[in-house]
């Protein structure tokens, strides 16, 4: 095309320069000025990488003065264009705008504009964009969205609770599973769903101080949720950045002590507009009707301000009725306002539980029993279902299940309380204790004697703590460099045990980090034993590396030496041998230690080895834990209660372990108390609640469907393609692991989620569970979500041109592949994507407007096409521009029908589902007061807003590909 002064052109290679103007032309070169950047470019006339900018009738253009005009006619005179049309601001018609006065800051965002302006993408980017649209739309429609992305085993009861609660509006529930059943994971799953769907954006987690890092690690490692830890220092820093320091972060963890210590701080927390509040160890919030504790009042104040509340607590049976009522009162003070009334209500649930047991037993029901069930459910048309349940037909079982669901919906606290017990959940290993009694070395005997004389004024508790760790008493006198490990028989025993069990992974836990470090040195220097160390002085990354080394099967560490605090929140269920080098001070810590291995999914029985020194507090404690509480070989829900009741007596025996008079009686009393309390807990078990919390076959089916999704090969292919196009290096490390590192030619200089040093990823859930240094990649992982955003929020792949070698079609035959997106705009919390996610509609049109998309599948067609370089592509586009315009108009006429069908289907689905949920809850409200008014109001409001948003839904062209047939 000839160049003329004043013409407007755009650079094919530097589109960011905007619109250029021809300012000089000679026989061989042309010079363009780009006014928006003030830069000049000199090109060869014969082969310049620039494209002539020509607008068509119907386009909207902007003048350099900022006003806009709709083009109605285009005139050309001496190679220069003049556009004639109507100004949009003044509605003046017949206005002429010469091309030299076009706005230079021109950005082509519509696919067709980019194509005609020569901004042609690589063919593989177009394919990636379409796949991104397709897979993204499919993922939103998955019924278990938000439950697949976490690095956890697929345990049915956890998935059941998370699926139920995570989909509610502002859930307010009590999670009261027995220890080891994964309350933290359930809470994390609920958070993950709520954050992913947009139902929540700001979350506050309040935990005891010692558990802050555990939660921080769990949320990051398992759910890719990056929380900020607020303490006094962080709070003071944040005060410089915002009036309310908590407004500086969306996801916050702080301790209960931190929250209640300062009145101003608590006010700031209450004013920070959280969507969800999570409180761990909520059973420690002391309450009585007359004197609630300050901690309880602080949480009560917060719970009044935050719409969603999750309380993690001990089981109701352990808490006692009053304490259990106090937790429920935090969730719904209007419903749970009278303790006496609550006690009476609980008694009335017994017949319901009996009715459920009766239905599940499968026996024929008498007429009286059928009548009782009918009255309890209170539905007018319940008779056919009752008859079906009592028949011999194939439908009897499903009818009984439906009746059980109806009963559970209508009675009890099942909407606000979830509690699973080990009795009701399969998959736990046995625990076997091996105690090793060892002589007390003379060096320790001397140190203990001297310490007793010098510390005569110490309290019994301090002396008891000292006596648990004789090596520390010895070091106090001999200095930190004292080589206690040279004579401590526990060290000798440990080395012997490890060398004779070389093939076993062994977890060794001791109270202090210093002990772990000293043991590592001894094992390495004396026996060449590979041991990783894990303690609170290490960063999270260092701990990850240590855990990963321990997890490696062949070349990894045989031993992981953990300190008490360092191992919090970490699970190593691939190991089944544990050595307690010393013993913790209370039963909760003991259970926490064993809980590192005793998890659902543990494949072997757990071997617990306790080498202890006679005539020390260890020998007292090992007997009390084992004979008094049976705490080594079984979980001990009674431990804390008994510990508190015999504390003073126990402390005296620990402080003076040589004075054992009456100790046998103490153990006997504790065992009797333990058995009585256990029987009491068992009797008080709420079977109705157990059935509801467990989820039964429904939960099993949910786990299986997610497991099937884990094997989705589309994800792996898409992710690799995505990483290639973004410019991320991939290095296959074997064992289903890949290392990703940034390259020098990335689409964006800093890709979120990819550190400078790179990351290790896996698509295999089992590998991710065993290797904490490998990130588990699913459709829900931030790396994939950020990649989808990067591709879909920009114009990557939105316009391209390809050649189709097909001798059955005439040379030069034109096809245009159009990707439309049907979507509705709405606030994220409406979760409109459940019904109408941005949905791609593909068309493949010929010159006559025939849509061949149904006959020609995308991937098959894509494999038949060949790429065209940008320069040749620009020439092709210019040659067929008028034809492409005509095909685009035919596409616009056809998309309306397809889009309307999608929108109508979404409206019907939304109306049906949301109306049904509202009707169900309104019906239940009459018989179950645990359904909150605000929940009903929210569902009705949500339904109205969803329907209004769907009424406003529309469509747009997202990408197009021009295909030209060739025979070469």
UniProtKB/Swiss-Prot annotation:
Residue positions binding ATP: 177-184
Domain Helicase C-terminal residue range list: 490-662
Enzyme nomenclature, EC number: 3.6.4.-
CDD domains: DEXDc_RapA, SF2_C_SNF
Organism classification: Bacteria, Pseudomonadati, Pseudomonadota, Gammaproteobacteria, Enterobacterales
A GO molecular-function annotation: helicase activity
Location of the motif DEAH box: 280-283
EC primary class: hydrolase
Assembly mode: Interacts with the RNAP. Has a higher affinity for the core RNAP than for the holoenzyme. Its ATPase activity is stimulated by binding to RNAP.
GO BP annotations listed: regulation of DNA-templated transcription
This protein's UniProt keywords: Activator, ATP-binding, DNA-binding, Helicase, Hydrolase, Nucleotide-binding, Transcription, Transcription regulation
Pfam families named among the record's database cross-references: Helicase_C, RapA_C, SNF2-rel_dom, Tudor_1_RapA, Tudor_RapA
Family indicated by similarity: Belongs to the SNF2/RAD54 helicase family. RapA subfamily.
Residue ranges of domain Helicase ATP-binding in the record: 164-334
SUPFAM superfamilies per record: P-loop containing nucleoside triphosphate hydrolases (SSF52540)
Keyword Transcription regulation among UniProt keywords: yes
Protein name as it appears in the record: RNA polymerase-associated protein RapA
Record's function text: Transcription regulator that activates transcription by stimulating RNA polymerase (RNAP) recycling in case of stress conditions such as supercoiled DNA or high salt concentrations. Probably acts by releasing the RNAP, when it is trapped or immobilized on tightly supercoiled DNA. Does not activate transcription on linear DNA. Probably not involved in DNA repair.
Organism: Escherichia coli O9:H4 (strain HS)
């Amino acid at each position: 095309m000839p160049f003329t002064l004043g013409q407007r052109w755009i650079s094919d290679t530097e589109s960011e320069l905007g619109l250029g103007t021809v300012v000089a032309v000679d026989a061989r070169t042309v010079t363009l000025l780009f006014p928006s950047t003030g830069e000049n470019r000199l090109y060869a006339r014969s082969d310049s990488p620039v494209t002539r900018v020509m607008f068509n009738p119907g386009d909207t253009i902007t003048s350099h003065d900022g006003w806009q005009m709709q083009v109605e006619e285009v005139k050309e005179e001496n190679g220069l264009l003049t556009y004639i049309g109507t100004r949009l601001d003044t509605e003046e018609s017949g206005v002429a705008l010469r091309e030299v006065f076009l706005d230079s800051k021109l950005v082509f965002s519509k696919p067709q504009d980019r194509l005609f302006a020569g901004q042609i993408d690589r063919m593989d980017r177009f394919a990636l964009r379409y796949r991104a649209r397709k897979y993204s739309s499919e993922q939103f429609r998955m019924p278990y969205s938000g439950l697949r992305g976490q690095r956890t085993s697929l345990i049915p009861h956890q998935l059941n609770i998370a699926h139920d609660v995570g989909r509610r509006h502002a859930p307010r529930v009590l999670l009261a599973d027995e220890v080891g059943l994964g309350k933290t994971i359930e809470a994390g799953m609920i958070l993950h769903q709520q954050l992913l769907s947009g139902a929540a954006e700001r979350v506050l987690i309040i935990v005891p101080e010692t558990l802050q890092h555990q939660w921080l690690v769990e949320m990051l490692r398992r759910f890719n949720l990056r929380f900020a830890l607020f303490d006094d220092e962080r709070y003071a820093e944040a005060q410089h950045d915002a009036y309310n320091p908590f407004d500086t972060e969306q996801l916050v963890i702080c301790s209960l002590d931190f929250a209640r210590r300062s009145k101003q701080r608590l006010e700031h927390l209450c004013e920070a507009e959280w969507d969800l509040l999570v409180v761990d160890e909520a059973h420690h919030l002391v309450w009585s009707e007359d004197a609630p504790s300050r901690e309880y009042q602080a949480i009560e104040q917060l719970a009044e301000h935050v719409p969603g509340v999750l309380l993690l607590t001990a089981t109701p049976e352990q808490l006692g009725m009053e304490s259990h009522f106090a937790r429920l009162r935090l969730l719904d003070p209007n419903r749970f306002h009278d303790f006496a009334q609550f006690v009476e209500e609980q008694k009335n649930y017994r017949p319901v539980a009996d009715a459920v047991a009766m239905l599940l037993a499968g026996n024929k029901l008498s007429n009286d029993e059928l009548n009782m069930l009918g009255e309890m459910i209170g539905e007018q048309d319940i008779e056919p279902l009752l008859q079906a349940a009592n028949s011999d037909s194939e439908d009897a079982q499903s009818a009984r299940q439906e009746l059980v669901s109806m009963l559970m919906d209508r009675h009890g606290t099942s909407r606000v309380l979830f509690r699973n017990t080990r009795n009701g959940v399969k998959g736990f290993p046995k625990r076997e204790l091996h105690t090793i009694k060892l002589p007390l070395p003379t060096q320790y005997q001397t140190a203990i004697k001297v310490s007793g004389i010098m510390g005569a004024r110490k309290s019994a508790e301090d002396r008891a703590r000292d006596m648990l760790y004789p090596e520390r008493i010895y070091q106090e006198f001999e200095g930190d460099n004292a080589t206690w490990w040279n004579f401590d028989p526990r060290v000798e025993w440990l080395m012997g045990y490890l060398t004779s069990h070389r093939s076993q992974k062994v977890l060794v836990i001791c109270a202090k980090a210093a002990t772990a470090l000293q043991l590592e040195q001894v094992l390495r220097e004396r026996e060449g034993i590979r041991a990783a160390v894990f303690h609170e002085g290490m960063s999270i990354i260092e701990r990850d590396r240590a855990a990963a080394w321990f997890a490696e099967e062949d070349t990894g560490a045989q031993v992981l030496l953990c300190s008490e605090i360092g191992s919090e929140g970490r699970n190593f269920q691939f190991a089944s041998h544990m050595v307690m080098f010393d013993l913790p001070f209370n039963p909760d810590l003991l259970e926490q230690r064993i809980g590192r291995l005793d998890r659902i999914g543990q494949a072997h029985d757990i071997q617990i080895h306790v080498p202890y020194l006679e005539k020390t507090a260890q020998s007292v404690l090992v007997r009390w834990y084992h004979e008094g509480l049976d705490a080594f070989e079984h979980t001990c829900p009674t431990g804390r209660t008994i510990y508190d009741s015999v504390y003073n007596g126990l402390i005296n025996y620990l402080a003076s372990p040589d004075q054992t008079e009456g100790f046998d009686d103490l153990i006997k009393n504790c065992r009797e108390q333990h058995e009585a309390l256990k029987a009491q807990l068992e009797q008080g078990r709420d079977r109705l609640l157990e059935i509801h919390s467990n989820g039964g076959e429904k939960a099993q089916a949910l786990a299986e469907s997610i497991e099937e999704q884990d094997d989705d090969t589309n994800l792996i292919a898409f992710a690799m393609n995505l990483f290639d196009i973004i410019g991320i290096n991939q290095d296959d490390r074997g064992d289903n692991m890949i290392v990703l590192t940034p390259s020098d030619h990335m689409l964006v200089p800093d890709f979120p989620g990819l550190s400078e040093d790179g990351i290790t990823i896996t698509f295999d859930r089992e590998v991710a569970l065993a290797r904490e240094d490998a990130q588990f990649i699913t459709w829900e992982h931030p790396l994939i979500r950020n990649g989808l955003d990067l591709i879909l929020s920009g114009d990557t792949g939105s316009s391209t041109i390809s050649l189709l070698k097909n001798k059955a079609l005439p040379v030069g035959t034109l096809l245009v592949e159009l990707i439309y997106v049907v979507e509705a705009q709405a606030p994220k919390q409406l979760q409109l994507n459940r019904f109408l996610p941005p949905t791609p509609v593909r068309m493949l049109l010929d010159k006559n407007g025939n849509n061949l998309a149904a006959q020609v599948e995308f991937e098959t067609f894509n494999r038949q096409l060949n790429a065209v370089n940008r320069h040749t592509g620009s020439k092709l586009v210019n040659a067929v521009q008028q034809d492409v315009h005509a095909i685009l108009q035919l596409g616009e006429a056809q998309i309306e029908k397809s889009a309307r069908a999608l929108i109508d289907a979404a409206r019907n689905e939304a109306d049906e589902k949301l109306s049904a949920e509202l009707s169900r809850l309104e019906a239940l409200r009459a018989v179950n007061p645990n359904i909150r008014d605000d929940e009903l109001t929210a569902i009705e409001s949500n339904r109205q807003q969803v329907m209004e948003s769907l009424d406003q839904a529309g469509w747009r062209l997202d990408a197009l590909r021009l295909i030209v047939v060739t025979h070469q």
